[in-house]
Amino acid sequence: MQSYSIPFHSISEGGKQFSQLFLDYTSNTLATDALISQFYQHDYRNPAHLSAQIQTVSGRTYQRPELVLELTRQNQLFGSGPKTFERIQSLLSKKTLAVVTGQQVGFLTGPVYTIYKTLSAIVLTEKWHEHYPDFEFVPVFWLESEDHDYEEISHVSLLKGNSLERFSYSEASYQALSSAGATQITPEFLDWLGKEILEAFPESDYKQKMLTLVRESYKEGVSYEMAFATLLARLFYDEGLIIVSSHPKGFKTLAKSVFIRELETFPASSQNIIAQSARLEESGYDAQAKPRPINLYFFQENQRLKIEPRRQGSVELLPGKTTFSQHEMLEFAHSAPELFSPNVVLRPIVQDTVLPTVAYVAGPGEISYFGQFLRNYQFFNIPMPIIYPRASLSLLEPKISRVFEKSARILNEKEISGSLSRFYQNSQQFINELLLAASTVDIEDEATTAIQGLSDIFKKFGLKLSEIDPTLAQSVEKVMQSTLNQVENLKSKTIKAEKQRHNDLIAQIEKSRDNLLPGGVLQERVLNGFHFFNKFDTTLIKLLKELLLTKAFDKHLIVPL
């Protein structure tokens, strides 16, 4: 499978696509060295750091038997494949380590970068096992389902023709402040899914397969989280992917030590984040994660409520007026840890307390978050994982490839890589460059030269004929004028054709922009994976995996299909 790579900093079409922190993190420059040394525990580029992390994590004690039981139970519910259960069992050994990634539980797995994150984790486990054959590395996908931002997950974006369509659903039964992933699928949702989204899939050789895949995952009465996990398990059935939900009591029990320490020591973890964030901002970067005095939520009547400290050792649940003493909250943490939910600041700490995490595969925004978390890892006495950038891709459908092949010919280039690079940098400037190169003939100049030449020929011819018969000169004049009029007509037709040719080219580039940068945003952040699976089958996942096994993840990859 062929691919072309573009440095992240070169992608500026549609505005700045990446934060400065992410650009520095992936640029392999002195800025990268300075950033990583100050704000991260490990350098993802350095094999010595991976070796050290392997030794550190394998030497720690985890609740492995209990973890294996919980992961087995969950993945049986999700319908995971046999290889997944082999890998879960391998976690009983200290020599089995996790490469973790995760995402919110969006409809139909959300934007296609969810697929790329998952593939990135799988690819790293295979690469690292080759280099460290005495250790097993297992890919783990963390379901981020407890967030109560329903709007964040309740939509699907597809291309209909060349127009971006965003399909959103508002669940009438959704209770404000409840976990979005726990929302139950209703008959109304299934009706919307069938009529709005599945009907939007263009006819293809794989449409029926895709419809079956979705319908077998999204069923009445199951939660959004369960539907997401079931679909993800089917897509990666043969890859040994372990999927984990942090919501069940069995998992929360493994994490209760974090809840207890947070409640006993608040606002210490927030102060750690604030101090680290201040250093980050002094270095010219933005601090994105906002800590709270207590970085936990509390479930009450299915609502995920903030825990706010009050005077005299009490806490209040917000919104609302329920109060508990600090002692009562600690009792809950010991006896009913499922009532607690970490916020963005504490979630990684929970994750890496329970899982033997050697690395976390992160998107650009997550990499920025982790830059604020180093002190908190130290505070909770947990090794911070290697923060590895996920693979970033744009898929080039055949019709789009042909546009760039045509562009390359106009620009006299052997490959499309140059055209792609200039397109992602500034599409309008790229169009102007194409028009200049395409207009190889100056019609006005050529027509003027032809008219002048023909006029000279006819005048000489008229002079010769007038020597024989002076009246013939008038006939020559008429023929000349008719001929010159024909040249003028040809000039007008040529100019019109040239303009039309340019208009077609411009239209093709703009259609390409709708596909590669829908809404001015990178394709991977907008389009759902089923836009591609419906056209190219889910075997596309295996093809992309084979490609990524040969690539680093330090540039944006353009992949012709």
From Swiss-Prot:
Disulfide bonds: none annotated. It comes from the Bacteria. It is an enzyme of class 6 (ligase). Residues 472-517 form a coiled coil. Its EC number is 6.-.-.-. Keywords: Coiled coil, Ligase. It holds the Pfam family CC_BshC. GO terms for molecular function: ligase activity. Belongs to the BshC family. This is Putative cysteine ligase BshC. It comes from Chloroherpeton thalassium (strain ATCC 35110 / GB-78).
